Curated annotation (Swiss-Prot):
One of its GO terms (molecular function) is FAD binding. Keywords: Cell cycle, Cell division, Cell shape, Cell wall biogenesis/degradation, Cytoplasm, FAD, Flavoprotein, NADP, Oxidoreductase, Peptidoglycan synthesis. Pathway: Cell wall biogenesis; peptidoglycan biosynthesis. Belongs to the MurB family. It catalyses: UDP-N-acetyl-alpha-D-muramate + NADP(+) = UDP-N-acetyl-3-O-(1-carboxyvinyl)-alpha-D-glucosamine + NADPH + H(+). It comes from Syntrophomonas wolfei subsp. wolfei (strain DSM 2245B / Goettingen). This is UDP-N-acetylenolpyruvoylglucosamine reductase.
Length: 299
């Protein structure tokens, strides 16, 4: 079934029945049938083409910082971009980076060249590709503010460029979520500023994260999208759910907007806890909470 993949990728970049919990910041998830670690855009194109030709399910992810993999795992092929595709180049006030670059590394690189605009990304886990797909943001900044061009592989296997007006960037969403597009690189427009001012903002954001977020536990970041007119953390706290647990899944005592893995949690436990929080929000506030975490895998 996967013979052609074994023909063009070396065995050290192919993993059979790989536990997804080893590739997720939640530290949760069953095995994927086959995980591949491409080192170039061409390899991604070849793998996805093969999967389409053979009608094999294909899941592409970066560093697994915003996913919850179900306990039965993932059928088909998982393409992990976050291990490789890490090139960065800087020209004047623009940065080109491939999808596998860590956001923290990208924001540090910008600061090294006295370029402002990516300070908000300091401390956000995950890769550039995932950040583009969900228009990641924090502390008043988001990817939408800096993206100048994005390259992505289309469903027919071609490489296409997208300008900002074509990306449909919005709060935690983009065209790359809506359509079968695989982000492989981005060009970002920044602006010159004093390096010490940039680093001061980054240090402030990092300090605030350490103080307010449960970074000491595995999680997938903020569990829920922010509904209009509300802040999720205080809302969940007011409902009396701070510290509420289902097995090893827990509403964080430090920040109720985070569901954490407090010890050997299963995906089913996390999903049950999410359902409880959503039901309470509907009952107390008449709000349909939406998850920010992407749930993947076999039910």
């Amino acid at each position: 079934m996967y013979s052609e993949i074994f023909d063009f990728l070396p065995p050290e970049r192919i993993k059979i029945n790989e536990p997804m919990k080893e590739h997720s910041s939640f530290k949760i998830g069953g095995p994927v049938d086959l995980m591949v670690l491409p080192e170039s855009i061409e390899e991604i194109q070849r793998i996805t083409h093969y999967c389409r030709k053979k009608d094999i399910p294909c899941f592409v992810f970066g560093l697994g910082s915003n996913i919850l993999v179900r306990d039965k795992g993932i059928r088909g092929v998982a393409i992990k971009v976050g291990n490789n595709l890490k090139n960065i180049s800087i020209c004047n006030d623009t940065i080109f980076a491939e999808a596998g670059v860590r956001l923290a590394e990208l924001s540090q690189a910008a600061a090294d060249y006295s370029l402002s605009g990516l300070e908000f990304a300091e401390g956000i886990p995950g890769s550039l590709g995932g950040a583009v797909v969900m228009n990641a943001g924090a502390y008043g900044g988001e990817m939408k503010d800096v993206l100048k061009e994005v390259r992505a592989i289309t469903p027919d296997g071609n490489l296409s460029s997208f300008k900002p007006e074509e990306m449909k960037l919005r709060y935690r969403g983009s065209i790359f979520q809506e359509e079968e597009l695989i982000v492989v690189s981005a060009l970002m427009q920044l602006h010159k500023e004093r390096a010490e001012d940039i680093r001061a903002r980054m240090q402030d954001f990092a300090k605030r994260r350490r103080e307010k977020q449960p970074l000491e536990y595995p999680s997938a970041g903020s569990t829920f999208r922010r509904p209009a007119g509300f802040f999720v953390g205080p809302m969940i706290e007011e409902m009396g759910l701070k510290g509420f647990k289902v097995g090893g899944a827990e509403v964080s005592r430090k920040h109720a907007g985070f569901i954490i893995n407090s010890g050997n949690a299963t995906a089913n436990e996390v999903l049950e806890l999410i359902a409880i929080v959503k039901a309470k929000a509907k009952e107390h506030y008449g709000i349909e909470l939406e998850t920010e975490v992407k749930v993947v895998g076999e039910e």
